[in-house]
Structures are given as structure tokens and as C-alpha cells.
Amino acid sequence: MTMRASLAIENFLEMMSAERGAAQNTLESYRRDLEAAAEELAAKGVNLAEAETGHIRMTLDTMAAQGFAPTSQARRLSALRQFFRFLYSEGFRQDDPTGILYAPKKQKPLPKIMSVENVGKLLDRAALEANEAAEPGERIKALRLHALLETLYATGLRVSELVGLPVTVARTDHRFLLVRGKGSKDRMVPLSRKARDALQKFLTLRDSLPGSDDNPWLFPAFSESGHLARQVFARELKGLAARAGLAASSASPHVLRHAFASHLLQNGADLRTVQQLLGHADISTTQIYTHVLEERLHKLVSEHHPLAD
């Protein structure tokens, strides 16, 4: 590391400490990142304080090639950005070489996926409670929860789409639901026989309630919107999961939406079809499920290739 780079780093850290009150851990983190970049560039004959955009990009590319996480790369760029802004503000440079660089995006965590077995436990418990509930108030809630779950797992709707369904969608025995999704875009999603049956049982009881004719929502409630709040559904789902012997934290409407997509892919559906069913405008959003396809292909080769282990 050249003396000039070393001096520039020390001046920067002194400013961060004296003028901005940076914590010791922050200063040490800045030092590690800046000295690592300086040493790498010095090995190529480049002074960090005089580095250009291409040099900075090269250090980030090296980190990526060495397997550093996107968060580590972003932290390195943040330190360099602060460093060069300091040099610019102090008149040591006429530009900021990091100005047009972007931090690498953090990898999206894989969605939580509930197994087919556990989804089955949830649905079986919901059906049991719907059949056994005797008190009118409990019965309508149990039938509603069963209808919600069967419909969600059959269609993969967003929770906002599900609780906001108009009652007209359940007035027929059609095998498809017309759903209005994000951006007011309509899509057709198939509805299983079990989901249709659960909806009809709920609808029969719903229609017998006073004032039901005046409410346009399939799942009416005393709320600002007039329909069931998604938070209420999520809370009831967690309670059901606990009663089914599952961890309450493992169950949510979003987890069941992911289960719908993942189980379809595991059983042979293609990514484009799942994209359409989920209502994703861009295939890149659906690509979080590619790990499911990879697992399916690996299993396929393992089971059918003559030389597989």
C-alpha cells in the first residue's frame, strides 16, 4: 500500500471520527475495506487515492469471484464511496469514481415452503372443525376458514385478492375464478372441486345471515373495507396450524401461496404457467422457484439415468 493511499485513509478515518462521531467498530470496518482495496490496487500499480471507476469495479468483481456475499461487496463499495466523497470535498480529487457504481443486489431469500403433508394436515383440520362446529358463530367462522384455505391452496391467490373476492365469483359452479390482481389486471385461475364445495357450504350459511344480501364481498366483515381483513385471516390461520400440531410460525397466507407454486412445479408444471397463475407481470419474480425445478431435475436424473449413483 503506497504512502499516499495510507495517508488518505488515515485522514478520512480521522474526519469520520472527529466530525461525524463514527463508532470504533465502524471505523475499523472502513479501515479493513479501504486497506484491502488499496493493497489489491497497489499490486496492480494503482494508487487507491487516484483510482478510476474501472479500478473500483475491478475490486468489486474480484470480491464476487472470490465468493464474497453481496452484502460484503455492498459494504466495500459504501466505504469506498464515503472515502472518495471525502477526497472530493477536500479538493484532493475533481471527481468521484464511485458515482456511477451500484451495489450488488442482495439475494432474495428462498420462500418458506410448507410440505404437501403439512398442507394436508391444515386442510384436514379445517374441514374437521367446519363439520363439527355447532354454535352458529363458531360454525360460520370455521366454514369461512375452510373455504379460505381450500381456495388459497387451489389458486395461489395473493391474500389481498382472496379476502377481497366479490360474492359473485361463488354464485356459479364454474371451475374457474376471475381474479382482479395488481394493476387491475384480470386473470383466470382454476378452482378445484374441494375448493368449490367448501365455498358453497360457506356461501349457503353466509346467505342466511341478516344483511348478507347488501354486502358485495364473499367474505364480509365489520371492517373499513367491508370484507375480512387479511390480518384476521392470518391470525386465524396460525391458530389453526397450532391446533393441527404445526408450528404457528410456519403458517401464513403467503406461505400457502408459495406452497401452491412449489407443489405445482414439483409435479411437472412449467415456470411460465406458474407465472400466469400467480399473476406475476415479470417472469423474473417467479424465478425464485427455480430451486424447485433444479431439485426436480436432479431427482429425475438420479432415478432414471442408467449411470446415476
UniProtKB/Swiss-Prot annotation:
InterPro entries: CB, DNA_brk_join_enz, Integrase-like_cat_sf, Integrase_catalytic, Integrase_recombinase_N, Integrase_SAM-like_N, Recomb_XerD, Tyrosine_recombinase_XerC/XerD. GO terms for cellular component: cytoplasm. PROSITE patterns: CB, TYR_RECOMBINASE. The keyword DNA-binding applies. It is found in: Cytoplasm. Residues 109-302 form the Tyr recombinase domain. Pfam families: Phage_int_SAM_1 (PF02899), Phage_integrase (PF00589). GO terms for biological process: cell division; chromosome segregation; DNA transposition. One of its GO terms (molecular function) is tyrosine-based site-specific recombinase activity. Induction: It is induced 4 hours after macrophage infection. Keywords: Cell cycle, Cell division, Chromosome partition, Cytoplasm, DNA integration, DNA recombination, DNA-binding. It comes from the Bacteria. The keyword Nucleus does not apply. HAMAP family: Recomb_XerC_XerD, Recomb_XerD. Belongs to the 'phage' integrase family. XerD subfamily. Forms a cyclic heterotetrameric complex composed of two molecules of XerC and two molecules of XerD. Site-specific tyrosine recombinase, which acts by catalyzing the cutting and rejoining of the recombining DNA molecules. The XerC-XerD complex is essential to convert dimers of the bacterial chromosome into monomers to permit their segregation at cell division. It also contributes to the segregational stability of plasmids. PANTHER family: PHAGE INTEGRASE-RELATED, TYROSINE RECOMBINASE XERD. This is Tyrosine recombinase XerD. It comes from Brucella abortus (strain 2308). The lineage of its organism: Bacteria, Pseudomonadati, Pseudomonadota, Alphaproteobacteria, Hyphomicrobiales. The gene is xerD.
